[in-house]
From Swiss-Prot:
Function according to Swiss-Prot or TrEMBL: This reaction introduces a second double bond into the aromatic ring system.
Cofactor note: Reduced FMN (FMNH(2)).
GO biological process: amino acid biosynthetic process; aromatic amino acid family biosynthetic process; chorismate biosynthetic process
GO molecular function: chorismate synthase activity; FMN binding
Cofactor(s) it depends on: FMNH2
One GO CC term on file: cytosol
Binding site for NADP(+): 40, 46
Protein name: Chorismate synthase
EC number, UniProt record: 4.2.3.5
Sites where the protein binds FMN: 135-137, 256-257, 300, 315-319, 341
Catalyzed reaction equations: 5-O-(1-carboxyvinyl)-3-phosphoshikimate = chorismate + phosphate
The keyword Isomerase belongs to this UniProt entry's keyword annotation: no
Length: 407
């Protein structure tokens, strides 16, 4: 069973990701991880922190000479600002006089609407929001991206699967309604200021961000992850928690600020009749073919061989520059919410994080289906399964050949 966990605080010494259950033989380097972390920093509308934040990556265990060993993989991501926060975020007790002189240690008692501050303070008995916001911060997603790089490399090397994403809309901008991009389009997408796949939509998104920045406000949006090359049969229909769509939705909803997930055409299918909501099947030279992908590559909780499409809705960042009304929990008085340095819009970066969680879930599903202790063994198991699937679809291909369909 593939498992992953992260540790660390936003202004702590470092973030740590641990991946357990990955097979031996997967090629991965600290450079590959750093490249994915750099993609996470992309996007128009990011805050000042992105200008100096550099994700120094150290692989602590589980990889030797660029190849996984089969044991737990631990990855550390340094915090370049740690010297400024060393006393405030120290693990061991610090002299009270030293903390009193630090503006960074000022009590944060005015929780931000939409953030974890309020519920976290009450749940854990904190008098200060600092312990909450440090762990709840989206900075934690850097550790997830590091873990997801391992999964991404496994999917590519074992199954030939590629995971990418693009931004559908930002705020009230124009919405991208064209066909999903292919793996050859990723360079173009990452070169876009907002990771958009359409120049006109990109201009509309940038205008939205500029307007929000001028007004001292923040923006959310919608991103789509696309996965290419998946085999039929990952996931299961046998129980709810084995359904791949339930696992994907849970993983993506676990990303900070994500408030909605849909697979394929999702909510749009609720407005259609059944005759226009599903993907009809036809005979093709290689087996069953389809002309549409409304289901987004999943049927009955299982992959069906078509591209997987997962969309996520990100709410506007809750640290609003012009600040929202709140209550000071120390005095009970009405107040203005605390304001930490933040982005106007982090939707482009959210797409990379959605890719990460989708890759982790799919890698877990693939390992559950095909198993193996090494990359080579997983490949052999996959090849045997694919031969069995081809045999099962042979009558379809034979009929297609005899009838001249798809020629």
């Amino acid at each position: 069973m593939l498992r992953w966990i992260t540790a660390g605080e936003s202004h702590g010494r470092a973030l740590v990701a641990v991946v357990e259950g990955m097979v031996a033989g997967v090629e991965v380097t600290s450079t590959a991880i750093a490249d994915q972390l750099a993609r996470r920093r992309l996007g128009y509308g990011r805050g000042a922190r992105m200008a100096f934040e550099r994700d120094g990556v150290t692989v602590l265990s589980g990889v030797r000479h660029g190849v996984t060993l089969g044991g737990p993989i631990a990855i550390e991501i340094d915090n370049t600002e740690w010297p400024k926060w060393e006393s405030v975020m120290a693990a061991d007790p610090v002299d009270a006089a030293e903390l009193e002189d630090s503006a960074r240690n000022a009590p944060l008692t005015r929780p931000r609407p939409g953030h974890a501050d309020y519920a976290g303070m009450l749940k854990y008995g904190f008098d200060d929001a600092r312990p909450v916001l440090e762990r709840a911060s989206a900075r934690e997603t850097a550790a997830r991206v590091a873990a997801g790089t391992i999964a991404r490399q496994f999917l590519r090397q074992a199954l030939g699967v590629e995971v990418l994403s693009h931004v559908i809309s930002i705020g009230a901008s124009a919405r991208y309604d064209g066909p999903p991009p292919g793996s050859e389009d990723l360079t173009v997408i990452d070169a876009s200021l907002v990771r958009a796949f359409d120049e006109q939509v990109e201009k509309s998104m940038i205008a939205e961000i500029e307007a929000a920045k001028k007004d001292g406000d923040t923006l959310g949006g919608v991103v789509e992850a696309v996965v290419l090359g998946l085999p039929v049969g990952l996931g299961s229909f046998t129980s709810g928690d084995d359904r791949l769509d339930s696992q994907l939705a849970a993983a993506v909803m676990g990303i900070q600020a994500i408030k909605g997930v849909e697979i394929g055409d999702g909510f749009a299918t609720a407005r259609r009749r059944g005759s226009c909501a599903h993907d009809e099947m036809y005979s093709g030279p290689g087996g069953v073919v389809r002309l549409t992908n409304r289901s987004g590559g999943l049927e009955g909780g299982m992959t069906n061989g078509q591209p997987l499409r997962v969309r996520a809705a990100m709410k506007p960042i809750s640290t609003v520059p012009r600040a929202l009304a709140t209550v000071d929990l120390a005095t009970g008085e009405e107040a203005i919410a605390i304001h930490q340095r933040s982005d106007v819009c982090a939707v482009p970066a959210a797409g990379v994080v959605v890719e990460t969680m989708v890759a982790l879930v799919l890698a877990r599903a693939a390992l559950r289906k095909f198993g193996g202790d090494s990359l080579g063994e997983t490949r052999r198991n996959l090849a045997a399964y694919q031969r069995a699937v081809a045999d099962r679809e042979a009558p379809v291909a034979q009929y297609c050949g005899e009838s001249g369909i798809g020629g």
